[in-house]
């Protein structure tokens, strides 16, 4: 999808991360990333050469996918319950998961962090690891696009004690980042 494409674009030539595996639904599994995405590539930059020939794995084959990676960026199109379950399955393979999905945003032991604002929220990971029975695996989520944009500004304004803040968003109707 669009978020996966954005991940691929942002991770191209990244100094810390290398995309070694892509996973999607059974419908795309077995195809190359280029075949699976095809004309649906919507980024302004071309599809990175490094991912074009990667064979898409089935996201539901958790053990197999997790054995090929050290870290998972998650942006899947499933029900919230399915997302929660599969992200925790990945975490239980001792694979850290950073999720773009909203499913875990209200899970008490899953941190939702804007690092410059609330890095202390990472502390809840230890409680999550106990619940999941993991030593390395966990799930962390990012806030929605509006909150992550406003949080730094609102935090800076706190010292001025505003009594009213009006925020307007112009989000994509689809919620898929299409503007």
For each feature predicted by the language model, list its residue ranges.
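N-terminal Rossmann-like NAD(P) cofactor-binding subdomain of oxidoreductases
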Residues: 1-179
């Amino acid at each position: 999808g669009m978020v996966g494409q954005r991940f691929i674009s942002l991770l191209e030539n990244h100094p810390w991360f290398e995309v070694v595996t892509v996973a999607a639904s059974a419908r795309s599994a077995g195809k190359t990333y280029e075949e699976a995405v095809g004309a649906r590539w919507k980024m302004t930059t071309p599809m990175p050469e490094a991912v074009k020939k990667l064979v898409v794995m089935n996201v539901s084959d958790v053990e197999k996918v997790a054995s090929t990676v050290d870290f998972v960026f998650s942006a899947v199109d499933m029900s919230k319950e399915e997302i929660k379950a599969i992200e925790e399955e990945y975490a239980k393979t001792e694979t850290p998961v950073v999720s773009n999905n909203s499913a875990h945003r209200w899970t008490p032991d899953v941190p939702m962090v804007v690092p410059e604002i609330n890095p202390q929220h990472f502390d809840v990971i230890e409680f999550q690891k106990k619940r999941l029975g993991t030593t390395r695996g966990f799930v962390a989520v990012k806030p929605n696009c509006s909150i992550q944009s406003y949080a730094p500004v609102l935090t800076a304004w706190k010292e001025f004690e505003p009594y009213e803040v009006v925020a307007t968003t112009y989000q994509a109707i689809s919620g898929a980042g299409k503007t």
